[in-house]
């Protein structure tokens, strides 16, 4: 089973894929930035970076977890951007 979460932040597309047996993947603008392999039982974290032309970069952190269904939280520079609250 595959679950996909996505958000566009300041013109950059952030996508997280979660599968039961192939782990989790973080893509930023279509490029793979982090990956966890295998089956995660309770939670996982992924890390990435938004690279801006002017040189300032922003850190991405993804938290995945859940008992029955997978929930996803995406943070940019420690600010929650997905899901919107």
Pin down the residues of each PLM region.
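Terminal leader/tail segments of proteins
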Residues: 1-85
């Amino acid at each position: 089973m595959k679950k996909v979460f996505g958000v566009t932040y300041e013109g950059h597309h952030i996508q997280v894929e979660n599968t039961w047996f192939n782990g989790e993947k973080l893509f930023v603008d279509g490029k793979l930035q982090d990956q966890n392999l295998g089956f995660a039982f309770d939670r996982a974290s992924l890390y990435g970076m938004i690279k801006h032309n002017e040189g300032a970069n922003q850190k991405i952190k993804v938290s995945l977890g859940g008992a029955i269904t997978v929930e996803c939280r995406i943070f940019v520079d420690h600010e929650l951007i997905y899901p919107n609250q």
